[in-house]
């Protein structure tokens, strides 16, 4: 599965768990009912902590395991209430609430045209998205939909769990290494219930949903190892990869992270992240969380090639400078600067950096990382390892794109994965 093709759709397992309308009837398999008030409260809290993530899994680094959203919601309920609810019960409850919420929204829409549009756009949403008030608001542009508030604060992170409460645990969090809060994508509601996720036709669908601005767009990025098996064949292993994706207006917009939360992970001196963001343009800054795939046999033979490839597109003919800064504990260790000229292809200017050799520091770092016996040890090291990628217009010195990259180790069966956020300063 391509990591960049994650959408808000449900996983195959969740699709299999769809229930008929009879699921609207309460299920009483214990004295208090499956969704007694305390369980429902914890369920709603978990919905806020874990936004819909489709087929993506959420990693708990201190355990080295990856979980689906429904598994984490069930886990959260257990930790908060001490009562067990299965992943299937959570999935069924989400289906029930989605149907109820759909009916409620339809009943509030008096205009038939608006109702038809609402039906059309809700048909493309998963039950998990429908249950999310934020997702409904963003999809349909319905003003004034209240978001649930719960004790413990409005954030998505474990600060919501008050210490000392029954079952409180620091295990309940989407990304252990990220202590910074994620803000949902915000779009202004449009009168008449037009879908806010569909901008004017002149704006391409990828804009706001991938790494790019009106001046430059990242099409593909990969760091890889090539090993020669025999004189005629090579084996290519992807450590990290952002692949080409066909975005649609129904895809969710990127979530936002406050850039001040990651300043200490990147150089602060001249040319550092803080200074670059201050100069702007601020819509060119992105955070990429990579789950690197280290599940490969690394040999020290001369036939091994460590490389990085990337491709960008623009409507402008420019000469660009690509800077890659490898950082440890927020300090720059090594920097590589490359200059690339445009090639005009299919009505746009394309910039390709193909098979750029990885620096010796990075190769040694990967080897040492691979020799660590446990994944939690690797993640502990990676917590203090970052990469800053900056693409600049060589002639004007304008920042075209800036990608702040943080890392964890992927579970071997899932391969390389990533998630992209916009960097903002509120």
From Swiss-Prot:
It comes from the Eukaryota. Residues 15-28 have a biased composition (Basic and acidic residues). GO terms for cellular component: nucleus; TEAD-YAP complex; transcription regulator complex. Residues 167-426 are annotated as: Transcriptional activation. The modification Phosphoserine is found at residue 11. Transcription factor which plays a key role in the Hippo signaling pathway, a pathway involved in organ size control and tumor suppression by restricting proliferation and promoting apoptosis. The core of this pathway is composed of a kinase cascade wherein MST1/MST2, in complex with its regulatory protein SAV1, phosphorylates and activates LATS1/2 in complex with its regulatory protein MOB1, which in turn phosphorylates and inactivates YAP1 oncoprotein and WWTR1/TAZ. Interacts with YAP1 and WWTR1/TAZ. This is Transcriptional enhancer factor TEF-1. It comes from Mus musculus. The gene is Tead1.
């Amino acid at each position: 599965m391509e990591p960049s093709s994650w959408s808000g759709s449900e996983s195959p397992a969740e699709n299999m768990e769809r229930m008929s309308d009879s699921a609207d009837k309460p299920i009483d398999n214990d004295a208090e009912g499956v969704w007694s008030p305390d369980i429902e409260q914890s369920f709603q809290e978990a919905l806020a902590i874990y936004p819909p993530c489709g087929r993506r899994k959420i990693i708990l680094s201190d355990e080295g395991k990856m979980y689906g959203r429904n598994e984490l919601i069930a886990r959260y309920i257990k930790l908060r209430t001490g009562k067990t609810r299965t992943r299937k019960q959570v999935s069924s409850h989400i289906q029930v609430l989605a149907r109820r919420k759909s009916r409620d929204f339809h009943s509030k829409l008096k205009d038939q045209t608006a109702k038809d549009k609402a039906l059309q756009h809700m048909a493309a949403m998963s039950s998990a998205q429908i249950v999310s008030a934020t997702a409904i608001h963003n999809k349909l542009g319905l003003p004034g939909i209240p978001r649930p508030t719960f004790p413990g604060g409005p954030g998505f992170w474990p600060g919501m769990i008050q210490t000392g409460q029954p079952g409180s645990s620091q295990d309940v969090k989407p990304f252990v290494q990220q202590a910074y809060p994620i803000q949902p994508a915000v779009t202004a509601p449009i009168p008449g219930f037009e879908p806010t996720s569909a901008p004017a036709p002149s704006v391409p669908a990828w804009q706001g949903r991938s790494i790019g601005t009106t001046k430059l767009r990242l099409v593909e990025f990969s760091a890889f190892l090539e090993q020669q098996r025999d004189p005629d064949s090579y084996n290519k292993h992807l450590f990290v990869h952002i692949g080409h994706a066909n975005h649609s207006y129904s895809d969710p917009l990127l979530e936002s992270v406050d850039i001040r939360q990651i300043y200490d992970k990147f150089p602060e001196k001249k040319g550092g992240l803080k200074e670059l963001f201050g100069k702007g343009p601020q819509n060119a800054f992105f955070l990429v969380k990579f789950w690197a795939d280290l599940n490969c046999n690394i040999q020290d033979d001369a036939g091994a090639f460590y490389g990085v490839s990337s491709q960008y597109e623009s409507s402008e003919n420019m000469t660009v400078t690509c800077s890659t800064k490898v950082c440890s504990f927020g300090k720059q260790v090594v920097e590589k600067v490359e200059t690339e000229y445009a090639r005009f292809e299919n009505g746009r200017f394309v910039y390709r950096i193909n098979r750029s050799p990885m620096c010796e520091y990075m190769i040694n770092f990967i080897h040492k990382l691979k020799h660590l016996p446990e994944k939690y040890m690797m993640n502990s090291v990676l917590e203090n390892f970052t990469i800053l990628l900056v693409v600049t217009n060589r002639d004007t010195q304008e920042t075209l794109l800036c990608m702040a990259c943080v890392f964890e180790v992927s579970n071997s069966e899932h391969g390389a994965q990533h998630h992209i956020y916009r960097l903002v300063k509120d």
